[in-house]
Regions:
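The alpha/beta-hydrolase serine catalytic core
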Residues: 1-2
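Conserved serine/cysteine hydrolase catalytic core
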Residues: 5-67, 76
Length: 101
């Protein structure tokens, strides 16, 4: 098992703790700054491969991304969760390849 000891789990634990859930979180200012700058990419093609059953990035987040990138090419995999490439790999890989061509 990859997470059989604290030494193997600590990085994941720190990553989760760094997700800003409150405006007072130390990462929130940086995340907001990045979000404010996303509009600079609106003239570029954007493709999203989205899991319809994602427990973390739900439909509310997808709507936000669609508002930022109205021309975004969205592939919604209704049965996929957070790990789209594991749940809908063949289809997602095809869609990503199409976007890159």
């Amino acid at each position: 098992f990859p997470y059989d000891s604290w030494a193997h789990r600590v990085a994941v634990w720190r990553f989760v703790r760094d997700i800003p859930l409150a405006s007072s979180h130390s990462s929130m200012a940086l995340l907001k700054d990045i979000g404010d700058k996303l509009k600079h990419f609106q003239k570029h093609p954007v493709t999203a491969c989205w899991g319809g059953k994602d427990f973390c990035f739900n439909q509310q987040y997808l709507r936000k991304w669609n508002n930022i990138f109205p021309e975004m090419n969205t592939h919604l995999y209704s049965e996929a969760g957070h790990y789209v490439l594991e749940d809908a790999g063949e289809e997602a890989i095809q869609d990503i390849g199409d976007a890159l061509r």
